[in-house]
From Swiss-Prot:
The lineage of its organism: Eukaryota, Metazoa, Chordata, Craniata, Vertebrata. Residues 1-20 form the signal peptide. It is a single-pass type I membrane protein. This is BMP and activin membrane-bound inhibitor homolog. GO terms for biological process: cell migration; negative regulation of BMP signaling pathway; negative regulation of osteoblast differentiation; negative regulation of transforming growth factor beta receptor signaling pathway; positive regulation of canonical Wnt signaling pathway; positive regulation of cell population proliferation; positive regulation of DNA-templated transcription; positive regulation of epithelial to mesenchymal transition.
Length: 260
């Protein structure tokens, strides 16, 4: 039983290690607005564990952004490098941004509500930008909480299933042991009864035959033969219902036994 428990414990540890490796080094999901991502709900999986956001036109600072998985980029030599572009005011802006978490390149309404890059200024635009940033923060927090619960469920369900399997195996082993012990006890009792009945029957037969031979010998010349034996034999016959071949008689005194 201890050996089976140790094997099951080692198996559970290996399963937990495998799940931890899959969760830490597995693929991540990225927000993708390309045409081929429409069928997958505007999401893609990155084997490089990296998402990107970049300008459609690097020469135009007001160009809209595109998002996707880093695996879909044709050129991988300058991946995730701080590529810079200059706008009309002379300030530098990044043309490619990379991140390495689930849906990290999803900015919600930020791309729509944010002012044009570079020349946009003014207090109203700053307020609008701050409001969109707060909305993005709330959306990201909600997404991260859902991801956390999903990962917790992915870890907890196999562990719970493994524990239930271990309990069922232990219960089955216990039931089999108790059933085996009960069958062994019944078999031992049956063998003991057969042994005692066989030997007891033969010993009683031997005692009755010995009593018959002893009572055939006369004790005296003028008294009944073996009155004590007669009483003992009658008691044995009443209990065991065994008939003897010897009939009782009277000793005549002439030296012979007369049968009745």
């Amino acid at each position: 039983m201890d050996r089976h428990s140790s094997y099951i414990f080692i198996w559970l540890q290996l399963e937990l290690c495998a799940m931890a490796v899959l969760l830490t080094k597995g693929e991540i999901r990225c927000y993708c607005d390309a045409a081929h991502c429409v069928a997958t709900g505007y999401m893609c999986k990155s084997e490089l564990s990296a998402c990107f956001s970049r300008l459609l036109d690097p020469q135009n600072s007001n160009s809209p952004l595109t998002h996707g998985c880093l695996d879909s980029l044709a050129s991988t030599t300058d991946i995730c490098q701080a590529k810079q572009a200059r706008n009309h005011s002379g300030t530098t802006i990044p043309t490619l941004e990379c991140c390495h978490e689930d849906m990290c390149n999803y900015r919600g309404l930020h791309d729509v509500l944010s002012p044009p890059r570079g020349e946009a200024s003014g207090q109203g635009n700053r307020y609008q930008h701050d409001g969109s940033r707060n909305l993005i923060t709330k959306v990201q927090e909600l997404t991260s909480s859902k991801e956390l619960w999903f990962r917790a469920a992915v870890i907890a369900v196999p562990i719970a299933g493994g524990l239930i399997l271990v309990l069922l195996i232990m219960l089955a082993l216990r039931m089999l042991r108790s059933e085996n012990k009960r069958l062994q006890d019944q078999r031992q009792q049956m063998l003991s009864r057969l042994h005692y009945s066989f030997h007891g029957h033969h010993s009683k037969k031997g005692q009755v035959a010995k009593l018959d031979l002893e009572c055939m010998v006369p004790v005296s010349g003028h008294e009944n033969c073996c009155l004590t034996c007669d009483k003992m034999r009658q008691a044995d016959l009443s209990n065991d219902k065994i008939l003897s071949l010897v009939h009782w008689g009277m000793y005549s005194g002439h030296g012979k036994l007369e049968f009745v």
